[in-house]
Swiss-Prot record:
GO cellular component, one term: cytoplasm
EC number(s) given by UniProt: 3.1.11.6
Protein's recorded name: Exodeoxyribonuclease 7 large subunit
Reactions accelerated catalytically: Exonucleolytic cleavage in either 5'- to 3'- or 3'- to 5'-direction to yield nucleoside 5'-phosphates
Family: Belongs to the XseA family.
Keywords, comma-separated and alphabetical: Cytoplasm, Exonuclease, Hydrolase, Nuclease
Cross-referenced Pfam families: Exonuc_VII_L, tRNA_anti_2
Parts of the chain that traverse the membrane: none
Subcellular location: Cytoplasm
GO terms of biological process kind: DNA catabolic process
Lineage, uppermost ranks: Bacteria, Bacillati, Bacillota, Bacilli, Lactobacillales
Subunit structure of this chain's protein: Heterooligomer composed of large and small subunits.
InterPro entries reported for this sequence: Exonuc_VII_L, Exonuc_VII_lsu_C, OB-fold_nuc-bd_dom
Highest taxon listed in the record's lineage: Bacteria
Length: 456
C-alpha cells in the first residue's frame, strides 16, 4: 500500500472514466442489436429503456429530437438495430448507451426497398390523383380478391348484402401472405380483367399484420397490375395505420373490409329515401305548373274578347265609318267646289258671251265631274274591299266561327274546360257547348288513344 495515497472524489473518478470513454474511438459510434426491454412510451419527452440479449443488458437513453425522427413505433420485446455512443452518467456513476437511430431488426432492408420502389413508381405517375377512377353508384357485380378462409370476405359480404342486396359478389381466392402471395394476387386480378366489363368494382384486401405479412401488397408486380385495371379498385390492406403501395395506387382506400364494402355499395334505404324526396319535389313542381297554367286559362277565358267576340270588329267598323264619312265629305266638298267653279265660269261667259268657249268648258266640266266621281267611287270600293277582307280574316279566327263549323268544347260540373280523358271518371256529368246551346251528358266509357284498346 502506498505511503501517501491520493484519494479521489467520486465525481473525479466518474469524470476520469467518462474521459476514457470519450477518448476511445471504438465507443464514438457503436452499432447494437438487441431486444427492447422496460420500454414505456413517454409522449413529447426523452425515452428511457434497456436493450438486452440472452446474457446481459444495457441502459439506453434516446433524446426526443432523435426519437421523433423514427418511422415506426417501438414496442416492448421488439428486436431493433440502434446506433449511438457510450458515455458515463456522472450523477449516478453508471454508463449507458445514447441511441441516435433505431429501426426494426430484419426490416431495415425492407423499409429501404419500399422507399426506393415508392419513389420510382411515384415518378412514373402511378399514384397521381388524375388517374383515379370514380366508384360506381349502383354496382351490379363486385369482385373480391382475398383469402377464402379469412374474415375479410365474410365482413364484405355481410355489409354489402345489408346495404345493397342487388349487387352480386364473386370471390377470387388468393394468398395474402408469403412468397407466393404476390403471384396469386396478380393472377386473380388478371382473371378479373379478362372478364371485360362483367365487374363494376374490385375490392382487394386482407387483415392487419407486420411489414413482412403485408409485403405482397408492396410488390411492384401487384402495384402495376392494380394500376392497369379497367374498373375501379378499392384497397383494404392491414389496419388504418398501415399503408402499402397497393393503398397508394388504388382508386380508393378503406381502413377495414367493412368500410371497403360501404365504399363499393350505396345504402339502399338512403337511396329509396332520396327517391321519395325527389318524387315529392317533382310532384309539387308539376302541381305548381298546372295551377299556373289553369290561372292563365282562367284569365283567357274571362277576357272580354272571348266574352263578347263581336267587339273584335268594333274598332275596324268605327274606322270604316269614319273613312266613309271622310270620303263622302271629300266628294261633297269637291262637287261643291266644282259647282262654284262652274258658276264662276258661267258668270264670266255671260259677261263675254263666248258660245263655243262655253260649250268647250261645259264639256270639260262634265268630263272632270265624271272622272272625279269615277275615281272617288273606285277608291271607296277599294276601301270597302279591304274592310271586307279584314273582317273575313277576323271572322276566320273567331272562336265562335270554330263552334259554328260543328266543333264543341266540354266543361265539367265546376265549369272547368276538359282537355284530356286522364282525369275523367265513369258516370261523371259533363256539358257540351254548341253554337246555339249546351247539352249535358254522362261518361259511360273512356277510351285512351295512346294504346287504342284500354277502356275504363
Amino acid at each position: 500500500m502506498a505511503d501517501n495515497p491520493v484519494y479521489l472524489s467520486v465525481s473525479d473518478l466518474n469524470f476520469y472514466i467518462s474521459q476514457k470513454f470519450k477518448n476511445d474511438p471504438y465507443l464514438h459510434k457503436v452499432f447494437l442489436q438487441g431486444e427492447l426491454s422496460n420500454f414505456r412510451f413517454r409522449m413529447h419527452s426523452h425515452q428511457y429503456f434497456s436493450l438486452k440479449d440472452d446474457k446481459s443488458k444495457i441502459n439506453v437513453v434516446m433524446f426526443r429530437s432523435f426519437f421523433e425522427k423514427l418511422k415506426f413505433k417501438p414496442e416492448e420485446g421488439m428486436k431493433v438495430y440502434v446506433s449511438g455512443y457510450v458515455d458515463v452518467y456522472g450523477p449516478q456513476g453508471s454508463y449507458q448507451f445514447y441511441a441516435q437511430t433505431m429501426e426494426p431488426a430484419g426490416l431495415g432492408a425492407l423499409y429501404e426497398q419500399l422507399r426506393q420502389l415508392q419513389e420510382k413508381l411515384a415518378k412514373e405517375g402511378l399514384f397521381n390523383e388524375d388517374h383515379k377512377k370514380r366508384l360506381p353508384l349502383f354496382p351490379d357485380r363486385i369482385a373480391v380478391v382475398t383469402s377464402a378462409s379469412g374474415a375479410v370476405i365474410h365482413d364484405i359480404m355481410v355489409t354489402a348484402n345489408r346495404r345493397f342486396p342487388h349487387a352480386e359478389i364473386d370471390l377470387y381466392p388468393a394468398k395474402v401472405q408469403g412468397d407466393e402471395a404476390a403471384d396469386t394476387i396478380v393472377a386473380s386480378l388478371k382473371q378479373i380483367q379478362a372478364q371485360g366489363d362483367k365487374y363494376d368494382v374490385v375490392i382487394i384486401g386482407r387483415g392487419g399484420g407486420s411489414l413482412e405479412d403485408l409485403w405482397p401488397f408492396n410488390e411492384e408486380k401487384v402495384v402495376r397490375q392494380i394500376y392497369a385495371m379497367q374498373m375501379p379498385v378499392i384497397s383494404s390492406v392491414g389496419h388504418e395505420t398501415d399503408t402499402t403501395l397497393a393503398d397508394l395506387v388504388a382508386d380508393a382506400r378503406a381502413a377495414t373490409p367493412t368500410a371497403a364494402a360501404e365504399y363499393a355499395t350505396p345504402n339502399l334505404a338512403d337511396v329509396l329515401t332520396k327517391i321519395v324526396q325527389l318524387r315529392a319535389r317533382l310532384y309539387a313542381a308539376m302541381q305548381a305548373n298546372i295551377r299556373a297554367k289553369r290561372q292563365i286559362l282562367d284569365r283567357l277565358r274571362k277576357a272580354p274578347v272571348l266574352q263578347e267576340p263581336t267587339r273584335i270588329y268594333d274598332q275596324q267598323i268605327q274606322q270604316v265609318d269614319m273613312l266613309s264619312h271622310r270620303l263622302n265629305q271629300a266628294i261633297s266638298n269637291q262637287l261643291q267646289h266644282d259647282r262654284s267653279s262652274v258658276r264662276l265660269l258661267q258668270e264670266r261667259l255671260k259677261a263675254l258671251n263666248p258660245g263655243r268657249r262655253l260649250e268647250q268648258l261645259e264639256r270639260e266640266r262634265t268630263f272632270i265631274v265624271a272622272n272625279l266621281f269615277s275615281t272617288m267611287t273606285a277608291y271607296l270600293k277599294d276601301q270597302r274591299n279591304k274592310l271586307n277582307r279584314t273582317m273575313q280574316q277576323l271572322d276566320d279566327i273567331s272562336p265562335l266561327k270554330t263552334i259554328g263549323r260543328g266543333y264543341v268544347y266540354t266543361t265539367d260540373q265546376e265549369g272547368n274546360t276538359v282537355t284530356s280523358v286522364d282525369k275523367l271518371e265513369i258516370d261523371e256529368k259533363l256539358k257540351l257547348h254548341f253554337k246555339d246551346g249546351q247539352v249535358q251528358v254522362n261518361v259511360e266509357n273512356i277510351r285512351r288513344e295512346k294504346d287504342g284498346n284500354q277502356e275504363k
